[in-house]
Amino acid sequence: MGTKQEHFFLQHVQDLYHRTIYNDYPSFTEFLTTGEMSALLQNQKMFPSVVLRMWGGHKDCDSKMAGFFPADFVDAYDQAFPICCIRISPVHEKYADTLIHRDYLGAVLNLGISRSTIGDIRICEKAAYLFCVEELKEFILSNLRQVKHTIMECREISELDEIPERQYEIHRQTVASARLDNIVAAMIRARRQTN
């Protein structure tokens, strides 16, 4: 994150911090990039007398919002965040294309939605779970009808237990030496190039 961008971001976050102090009510950022999360955590001392929390809608989300809470805030922090989850699934699974993250993200951004209002998109077989800011829920539910060539239906998920856990794959490779370029090349199944 460039110093100028970081400066503007931290000014915006300072405004949210002051809003929380003066209104005695939580304030939230939009979904943050990795650089913004890092800058915020490095400058956490700038925000005394409030509780800073980050949440993305589910326990293992990568994209998160930052929330500034008054010190005497008693509600559950994660439930206070203005995040909702939308399940996007094909109307007719039999005729559905095989879709990847890029397809879902492209369909959502094609609606004119800013990337900072969209959190993680979790793909599970033929469906996807989209985390977004609460104020976009109705817009997405009524306007997202198609991803690639597949007709979709959307519904809000209120129980987070319905969202599948993140799946990981274990790959075993043998490398000639434990150098980073050999390990990365083995992971992406590429050969090392010599010039």
Predicted regions and their residues:
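Ferredoxin-like alpha/beta domains used as RNA- or RNAP-binding modules
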Residues: 1-187
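Short, charged phosphate-coordinating catalytic segments
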Residues: 191-194
